[in-house]
C-alpha cells in the first residue's frame, strides 16, 4: 500500500470541488475524510489529493489539511501527525493564507517550511510542493493592492524553490503553468480551484510521480464530471459568502496592504511589479529554510 499524507490548507481539503460523498470511490482513507464536509447538506469537498490518490498503487490517503492553515500551523499541528504515519508520499501545499495575513513574515514562513519538508524527507517520504499563483491576480484586486500581494507571493515562492532544491521535492510550478490562469480553473471565490483546477493539480503531480519512477495508474481525467456553477450561482456566492469573507479580512489584511502600498509609492516602487528575478527576499539570521539537524542527528549539507 502507498501511504499518502496530505498537509496544507483548504486547497488540499478540496474546497472548490464539491461532490456528494456517495460519489467518491477510490482510495481508502485511513485518517481524515476524503470528502470533507461542505457548505450544504449531503455535500462535501473532494479535491486534488483524493483525485491523485485514485491513481496511486493501493493508496491509503491521510488528509491532514485544515481550512485556513498557514505554514506555521502545518508545522505545529499537522507535521507531528504526519511523522507518526511515516507516509510514502506527503504533500505540503500551503501559503495563500500566509500572503493574505496582516502579520506576513517570509522569514518565519521559511523556517517553518524548511523544518516541515526536511523532517518529512528525513522520515523517508517523497514530498510534493508547489509554487503558488499570485492571489492578487486571481482576485482581480486594484493595482495598488495587487502589487504588495504579488511581492508576497514571489517571496514565498522563492522560499519554496529553495526548500524544493535543498530537499529534493517534486515541485509543481503552478505560478508558471499557463493553464493555471484559465478562468475555468477557479471557483467563484477566485482563491480556490474549481473541479477542473483540482484535476489539473492532480494530473501535474501524477506526472511528476510517474517521472520519478512511482508505479501509478492512469492520470485523472482532465474534464470535470460535474456541471460547473452558473454565473448566477457565482454572483450569489460573491454577494453573500464572498462579501462576508472580505469584511472578515478587511480589519486585518487591507490596512496592512494599504500601508505596504504607501511605502512602495514613497520609495518609487509603486508603478509596476518587480521583474521575475527580483524577489526581494533573503533568509534572515536563523531563518534559513532547512533544519540544522535531521531526525537521525546528522547535519544537512549546504
PLM features: what roles do these ranges have?
Residues 40-44, 104-109, 144-155, 189, ...:
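Alpha-helix N-cap and loop-to-helix initiation/capping positions
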Residues 166, 189-192, 196-302:
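Conserved catalytic region of serine esterases and O-acyltransferases that act on ester linkages
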Residues 65, 131, 173-176:
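Residue-level recognition of beta-strand->loop/alpha-helix junctions
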Residues 1-67, 79-86, 294-296, 301:
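Serine-esterase "nucleophile elbow" of acetyl-processing enzymes
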Residues 13-19, 71-108, 134-135:
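Oxyanion-hole/transition-state-stabilizing segment in secreted/luminal serine hydrolases
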Residues 122-127:
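A short helix->loop->beta-strand "cap" motif at the edges of active sites that frequently abuts
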Residues 137-174, 195:
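Substrate-gating cap/lid alpha-helix
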Amino acid at each position: 500500500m502507498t501511504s499518502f499524507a496530505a498537509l496544507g490548507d483548504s486547497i488540499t481539503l478540496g474546497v472548490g470541488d464539491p461532490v456528494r460523498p456517495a460519489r467518491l470511490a477510490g482510495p481508502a482513507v485511513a485518517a481524515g475524510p476524503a470528502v470533507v464536509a461542505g457548505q450544504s447538506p449531503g455535500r462535501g469537498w473532494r479535491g486534488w489529493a483524493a483525485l491523485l490518490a485514485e491513481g496511486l498503487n493501493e493508496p491509503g490517503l491521510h488528509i491532514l489539511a485544515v481550512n485556513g492553515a498557514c505554514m506555521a500551523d502545518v508545522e505545529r499541528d499537522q507535521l507531528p501527525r504526519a511523522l507518526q504515519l511515516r507516509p510514502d508520499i506527503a504533500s505540503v501545499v500551503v501559503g495563500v493564507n500566509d500572503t493574505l495575513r496582516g502579520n506576513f513574515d517570509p522569514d518565519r514562513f521559511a523556517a517553518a517550511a524548511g523544518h516541515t519538508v526536511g523532517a518529512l524527507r528525513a522520515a523517508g517520504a517523497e514530498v510534493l510542493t508547489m509554487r503558488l499563483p499570485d492571489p492578487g491576480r486571481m482576485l482581480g484586486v486594484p493595482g495598488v493592492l495587487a502589487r504588495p500581494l504579488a511581492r508576497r507571493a514571489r517571496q514565498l515562492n522563492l522560499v519554496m524553490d529553495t526548500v524544493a532544491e535543498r530537499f529534493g521535492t517534486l515541485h509543481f510550478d503552478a505560478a508558471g503553468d499557463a493553464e493555471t490562469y484559465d478562468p475555468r480553473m477557479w471557483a467563484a471565490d477566485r482563491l480556490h480551484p474549481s473541479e477542473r483546477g483540482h484535476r489539473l493539480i492532480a494530473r501535474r503531480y501524477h506526472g511528476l510521480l510517474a517521472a520519478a519512477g512511482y508505479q501509478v495508474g492512469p492520470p485523472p481525467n482532465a474534464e470535470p464530471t460535474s456541471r460547473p456553477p452558473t454565473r448566477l450561482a457565482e454572483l450569489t456566492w460573491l454577494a453573500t459568502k464572498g462579501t462576508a469573507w472580505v469584511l472578515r479580512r478587511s480589519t486585518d489584511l487591507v490596512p496592512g496592504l494599504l500601508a505596504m502600498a504607501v511605502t512602495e509609492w514613497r520609495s518609487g516602487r509603486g508603478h509596476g511589479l518587480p521583474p521575475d528575478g527580483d524577489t526581494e527576499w533573503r533568509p534572515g539570521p536563523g531563518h534559513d529554510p532547512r533544519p540544522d539537524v535531521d531526525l537521525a542527528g546528522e547535519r544537512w549539507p549546504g
